[in-house]
Swiss-Prot record:
It is an enzyme of class 5 (isomerase). Consists of 3 domains; the N-terminus binds the ribosome, the middle domain has PPIase activity, while the C-terminus has intrinsic chaperone activity on its own. The lineage of its organism: Bacteria, Pseudomonadati, Pseudomonadota, Gammaproteobacteria, Moraxellales. Involved in protein export. Acts as a chaperone by maintaining the newly synthesized protein in an open conformation. Functions as a peptidyl-prolyl cis-trans isomerase. Belongs to the FKBP-type PPIase family. Tig subfamily. It is found in: Cytoplasm. Keywords: Cell cycle, Cell division, Chaperone, Cytoplasm, Isomerase, Rotamase. This is Trigger factor. GO terms for molecular function: peptidyl-prolyl cis-trans isomerase activity; protein folding chaperone; ribosome binding. One of its GO terms (biological process) is 'de novo' cotranslational protein folding.
Length: 447
């Protein structure tokens, strides 16, 4: 810091500090004089040739504006220097006010939001339930059956449509004899049991044969998204064109090769599936206990969050949702109107995330935690196992500094969880593979 800069601080609250900064007026005067001389070289004033305008005229016409520009520049150049000199952990941009020239000094006040220095409560009172699961043969068989279903085909079937069959049909809906928008379609495909349609629709089609026609009566749910249809009784004329049954692919060499199994047959596929499921269990269990631990801490630690942090988190979550929209609907994220996603939609979750970030940072600072590079290497190696060329993935995360920094951040957060768990009480609970993964998916959707 420049030795001629004077700074005093006044902590207004746990999240805000005010600095009073004094800059010697000579700094201002020297810069003002320099700029006035520069302006004089090109200034045009009636009655004088370019470059020959008297300095008194230049000062009279341009002096006040130049001085204000210089003051703004000096404030911009010194405010962050002042913040740094006081070891202030600022959040967002400072707010400048009360600017004045006083006793040979330029004096101004800078109010800045600061990273809260909280005393974390309840660390030794944490009680969480840690879910665990074991992969059994039935789980593996179910997973392989799901892999087959992902590649199932439908072949024509003679006879009545039953659960699991795919029916191709035309339908025409009406309410009180009047057709309604969206109530008709041709060559519509429906798998019986998929619950894709409103209640009663599938039941009306079940048992029909190709070439059969009939009218079914259904009632739209009271909470149906189209308000003009909600709770209304409707009639649908159904014309079944085709009934098909599911045909799963054989567990032959061609099917096995789809999953990278060239040797070892079905047993090798089962082994690969089991290992992948065990990785999923490890990740899901880790995610569950992390969430439970953080939830327990957040219940005991409510504190104000700097507005800048909250605004940044709201914007981050809004951008994430827009990205999900773009992936789901195939549109560019920039094409979505942000006004459709107001701040209020994200405030609760953003406040939680901001508080959690502060808590994690405080644990790291107060306990002197440093990222475990061995865990980083293990993390990268395990992540790479999910890709066709693990060596290439490892090289990418090892050489790309930003990507490695992201992984280090995740690992350090895991170390925080380990520390917190070590201070509290953890009870293990065995759950099924399906329940553990379903809980993880639900947790991710809520974020």
């Amino acid at each position: 810091m420049a030795t001629d800069l004077q700074v005093t601080t006044n902590k207004l609250s746990n999240k805000e500090t005010q600095l009073t900064v004094k800059v010697p007026v000579e700094k201002i005067q020297n810069k003002v004089e320099g700029r006035i001389r520069q302006v004089a070289k090109t200034a045009k004033i009636d009655g004088f040739r370019k470059g020959n305008v008297p300095m008194s005229h230049i000062r009279s016409q341009y002096g006040a504006g130049i001085q204000q520009e210089v003051i703004n520049d000096v404030i911009r150049d010194t405010v962050f220097e002042a913040i740094k000199s006081e070891d202030i952990r600022a959040v967002g941009m400072p707010n400048i006010d009360d600017v004045k020239l006083e006793d040979d000094f330029l004096v101004y006040q800078a109010t800045v939001e600061i990273f809260p220095e909280i005393d974390i409560q309840g660390i030794d009172e944490i009680e969480v339930e840690r879910h665990t699961a074991t992969v059994n043969e039935e789980d593996v068989d179910t997973m392989i059956e799901n892999l087959q279903k992902q590649r199932e085909e439908f072949v024509e079937k003679k006879g009545k449509a039953d659960k699991g069959n795919q029916v191709t049909f035309d339908f025409e809906g009406s309410i009180d004899g009047e057709k309604f928008e969206g109530g008709s379609a041709e060559d519509f495909k429906l798998v019986i049991g998929s619950n894709q349609m409103i209640p009663g629709f599938e039941a009306g089609i079940k048992g029909m044969k190709a070439g059969e026609e009939k009218t079914i009566d259904v009632t739209f749910p009271e909470d149906y998204q189209a308000e003009n249809l909600a709770g209304k009784e409707a009639q649908f004329k159904i014309n079944v064109k085709l009934v098909e049954k599911s045909k799963l692919p054989e567990m032959d060499d061609a099917f096995l090769e789809l999953f990278g199994v060239k040797e070892g047959g079905v047993e090798k596929l089962k082994d690969d599936v089991r290992k992948n499921m065990e990785r999923e269990i490890k990740n899901a269990a880790r995610s569950q206990v992390k969430q439970a631990t953080f939830d327990a801490l957040l219940e005991k630690n409510e504190f104000d969050v700097p507005n800048a942090m909250l605004e940044q988190e709201i914007e981050r979550q809004r951008n994430m949702m827009m990205q999900r929209f773009s992936q789901q609907f195939g549109a560019n994220a920039d094409s979505f109107d942000k006004d459709m996603l107001p701040n209020e939609l994200f405030e609760e979750q953003a406040l939680r995330a901001a508080r959690l970030g502060i808590i994690v940072a405080r644990v790291i600072d107060t306990k002197g935690l440093e990222v475990d590079q061995a865990r980083v290497e293990t993390f990268i190696k395990e992540a790479a196992e999910n890709y066709e060329d693990p060596a290439e993935v490892i090289e990418y995360y090892t050489t790309d500094k930003q990507q490695r920094a992201n992984i280090e951040s995740v690992v350090l957060e895991d170390q925080v969880v380990d520390y917190l768990i070590g201070q509290g009480k953890v009870t293990d609970k065995e759950v099924s593979y399906q329940d553990l993964l379903a809980a993880q998916q639900q947790q991710q959707q809520a974020m």
